[in-house]
Amino acid sequence: MWWLAGLAALLLFAFPYAERTRNASERPRLLQGMALVDTGSLAIDGPGARGLATGPDVARDPLRGRLYPNKPPGAGLVAAAAYAGARGLAAATGEPLTLRRYTWWARLLAGVLPTLLLCGWLARRFAPELGARRMWLALGLYALATPAFAYAHLLYGHQLTACLLTLGAALVVDGCRADRPLRAALGGGLAGAAVGVEYSAAFAGPALAVFVLSWARRGRWRAAVGALVGAAGPLTLLGLYHASVYGGPLRTGYHHVIDPTFAAKHGEGFLGLVAPSWAAFHTHLLASEGGLLWWAPLAPLALAGLWDMSRGTGDSALRSHARVQLAMFLALVLACASLNFEGGWRVGPRYLVAVLPALALGWGRALAWVSEHPLRVGLFVALMTWSLVINGLAGDLWPHLDLTNIHQPVSEVLLPLWRAGRTPYTPAGVGITGALIAGLLGLLILLRPGPRAAAIAAGLGVAAGLGLVAATALFAPHPRGAANLAYIERVWEPPPDGAAVSAILEPLSR
C-alpha cells in the first residue's frame, strides 16, 4: 500500500485552477451538482446556478426550454455529492463555500479517488499473476505518465469512466469464468454506469457482450444473465433521464446542443460519428498536439503485452482479461478514428482515456521483456522520462489545453510556465519540480535496473528523455502561440499576492 500512498500524494500535490477560464467541460457538471442539492433539479439555469455562466457545453430541453449539460448526468451526480459534503463542511467550520473549494472536492471525488481505487484494485487483482513490483510499475506508468494524470485533476468524468468501465469489465470476466452471477451483475452494473458518465463508453460494450455470450454458450448462462441484468439497471435509468429531459430514451444532450458549431458537428452522421478517416486517426493517435503516441509513447509496448497474453496457451483468466481489454481499446480507437471533432480543451486523446487502464495490464506483461538488457532499458527509460515529465507538467500546471492556437503544447505552454516559476495551488506554494523528480525516482526504483550496464543505460535514458522534452523547442510555434500563453498567464492562479478571489456560493434561502 506504500506505492498507492505515493500515487495519492503525487495526484493530490497540485490543484491547477483558474476560475476565469470557465472550463466548458467542468462548469456544467459543477452547476448540475449545485442545482441537484439546492433545488432538487438537474437543470442548470435555475437559482442553484447563482448566476454563473454555463459555457457552451450545454443542451436545451425541447419540452420546457431548460438548460442541462450536454453530457450524461453521471459526473453531475458525483459533483452533487461533493457539493453536499463541501457545503456541510463549510457550515460546520463557519467558512463561506467558494467555487474554488467546491471544485477541489468535485475533482477529488470524480478524478483522484477513482484513479486510486482503480490502481489499488488492479494491483490486488493482477499482482499475484504478474508480480507485485512489475504491476506497480505498470500502474505508476498509467497514473503518472499518461493523460490519466491530467484528467485525475479535472471534473471531466474521464477517470470516473475509466474506473467504472475497467472494474466492471474485469468483474464480468471473472464472474462469467467462475459462473458467479452476483459478481457478473456487479460488473455489468459498473460497466453500464460508465455510459451514464461518458457516452463513448458504450463503444466498449460490444467487446464485453461478445465475451459474455461466448461464456453463456459454455454453460455459464447464470453469470451471463447476471451481467446483462446488471448492465440494464443503469442504462434504464439513463434512458429515463433522456426521456424526462429530451423526450425519448435515445435522445441525448448532443441532439439538442445550443452552440451552433457543436450542433453542426453533432448533426453529421450519428452524433458526429462518421466513417473512419486518416485525419481523425492522425488527430487522436499521431498528432504532436494531442496524439496518443506523443503523450504515451510506451502504449505500443503495452498493446504488444496485451496481444501476447491474449494468445497464451490454455484457458487462463489472464488471457480472457487481455482479450477483453484489447478489444475494448481497439473499439475506442476505431470510434475516435470516426469522429468529426477533435475534443476541445484536452491533454492527449481525451476520448481514449476511458480505456487507458488496458495499457497497465499490457505493461504488466511487457515489462518482463525490458529485463536487464541495457539497450532496452535505456530506450524504455527515455520514453518513460519523456512521458512522465510532459504529463506531469500538464496535469500539475495546465490540464486543459486549448489546441486551437498551439502547434506544440510542451514548448509553447508547459515549459514556458515551468521556466517562469508558475506554481498552482500546492502545499505551502512549493513548486512542482520536486513532485516530478519524486515520481520519476519512484518509477526507477520499481524498474530496478540490475547490472551496472543496465543502470548506466537507465541514467542515459533519463538524460535522453529530458533531451526529448527540451527538443520540443524545435517545433515552429503557432502564430497565435504567444497570445495564447499571455492569456494563460493573465488568468493564472494563485497570483503572486496569494489566493485569487473566488465566487462565494451562498446558501439559497428556502
Task: Kindly give the residue locations of the regions a language model identified.
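Transmembrane-helix signature of polytopic, membrane-embedded enzymes
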Residues: 2-5, 91-98, 119-144, 162-163, ...
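Short helix- or helix-capping micro-motifs
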Residues: 9-10, 135-146, 166, 170, ...
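Membrane-interface alpha helices of multi-pass inner-membrane proteins
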Residues: 33, 138-139, 143, 183-198, ...
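Transmembrane-helix motifs of polytopic, lipid-linked glycan transferases
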Residues: 105-130, 167, 171
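Hydrophobic, aromatic-rich transmembrane alpha-helices
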Residues: 119-122, 210-213, 293-319, 323, ...
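Membrane-interface transmembrane helices that cradle and orient dolichyl/undecaprenyl
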Residues: 158, 168-184, 310
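Perimembrane helix-loop-helix junctions
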Residues: 174-177, 203-235, 239-240, 303-317, ...
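Membrane-lumen/periplasm interface segments of specific transmembrane helices
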Residues: 223-305, 322-336, 386-405
